Amino acid sequence: MSHFLLELYSEEIPHGLQIDTRQNIEVLFNKKLTEYNIAFKKFSVFSTPTRLCVSIEGLPSTLSVPSKEIKGPKVGSPEQALAGFLKSNQSEQKDVFEKTIDKGNFYFVKTKKETLDLQKLFATTVPEILQSLSWKKSMRWANHSLVWGRPLKSILSLFDNHTVNFNFHHLSSSNKVYVGSVQEEKQVNIKSAGQYFQILKDKNIILDQNEREKMVLKSLSAIFKKTKSEDSPNLRLVEEVTNLVDYPTALKGSFSKDFLELPEELLHLTMMQHQRYFPMKSLETEKITNTFVTISNNKDEKKLIIDGNERVLQARLSDAKFFWDKNKRQNLVKNVSKLNGITFYKELGSLYDKTQRVRQLASLISDIIGANKGDTEIAASICKADLVTDLVGEYPELQGVIGKYFAISQGFSSEIANAISDHYLPLGPTDNVPKEKIAICVALADKLDTLIGFFGIGLKPTSSKDPFALRRAVLGIIRIIIENKLSISLKELINNAKNLYLSNNIDITNAKLADDLIEFFNDRFKNLLKDKNLRLDVVDSVLFKNRSDDFYSLFLKITTIAKYIKKPEGMNAIATYKRAKNILEQNEQIIKDTIFGNPDVVLFNSEIEETLLVKINEIKDYFTTPSRLRDSAKTIQMLSEVKLITDQFFEEVKVNDDNEDVKKNRLELLLLMCKTFDNFTDFSKFEGA
């Protein structure tokens, strides 16, 4: 069996581009292998900062291609169409034959059975694949026409011990590979795919990113264990540093303990995001220590690498401490007026205006959920005050977090301080939501104010663009409501928020604002339920029947129905509805014109008809108290109890009675029952109903 190997050697490619390109090139190669029906045993895509490698093992050396018929233009088409078809398939007029298929009479040609040399096939197809490879970010260099992630320097292409020769823009493939450092870079001849991997390994180049990741985790774990630190490295950072080195080596460094007075989040951001270092946390104290781990591309026998990293971190932390010492003395309350100088959005006023609207709306929400009104207004008033500080200007990712620490140092309560940091939450679909009542009020008010503003001036998200993160804001509101079990009328809050804009003399031009927003909320709510793997028929049954803006009640109802739908209670309720619905559908024309769900007891001629009506009225009375409908489990139980009565009803009573009045009256009874069921949820949406 044969082995194909391709290496694309370039200047260093950022880790994110490596991940995308590995996936893209795998898809393109697999598509081509499938197109030619080429079997193989193992397909691998590897990358290092400078290398992108495709390895396909267990290939045949030749490929037998059977003859096949190729459909051309319809018989009677212009001669140019037929000529183009023949040219594209390298055929002549004598090769053409006519054939009738479903869509009419067409010209066909039949290819010849042939045997392809796979080495030659790769020489043709690989340049096509490389040309179709797309990059999220790309560049041109020198005077070359090639667009690539980073300047491409060489192409190695082997089929067993033979070079697969092809040209790609200004480069020609070869059997040579670059090894050594940038300063001492040299080319080495490769005789086979097996030798390629061995030469790289001998040069401390681990081509397999999965193997490098294991090395990173193992070396981190060894240092954490030795220093009695928590062994829980950030896995995103692990993936990133894995793609930044050829041969990962973990090195431990330290910094001055004076910097430990800085907020932990600031230390984390400086080390992890800016320097790609792994902070270390003591197992004993559960606090961050003045040590860190960096992943190097080389061993550091002379301590030069770690010394350099320590100096860089010292400088960064010194800058952070300078801003911290400078800003922490600034009074948050006095900072609020400075928000007048920051525009929220050109048509929506300043951040000061936004803060005042958020304060009033949060105050209203505090009455609904029982939060401390005074503290809520204070928290909302200063929730954006840290945005005018140099520290947040330098570290914008820490907006809110910095405000929290300033608030604590200035004597505000922990609830107010937490609201400043937590009102931005959740930042993503898996982030925690605010749990304290004051933080909930400010978070809901801030997100609603943003939504009202942008929807109000017609800047709604499109299918491809959402520059103001409005989908995230909506999903955040829904999650805050559901996860904190809050029954809130969003429409009422939307109207209040709109009035606050109008009182600021900001024109809200969208006349259908509330309806548009609730529809947008419903769409995101459906997506949330889908992500939770809830049955779509259950979701549709509830949302079709309930145009509610109380998303916690809807969520409770959907999850309860989903829980009971496969239990005896749920199956009984569906079976009862289905049997009655089938009979009604058989008499659709009669029902459409004359049946409205109002049975006449005078026309009853059996006890079971009266019993069924009593039970239906009992359920209707239960439904007249809206709060009872929130107990979905009890409701399903009640609906399921009807089955015993309906079973007896269908056994003892002939619905399609010979007496037309009796028949219609029994249809009235069944329609009343179905309508009563549908008051809870639309049973017709259930699969099988």
Task: Specify the residue positions occupied by each region the protein language model found.
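Amphipathic alpha-helical "coupling" segments that flank catalytic cores
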Residues: 1-689
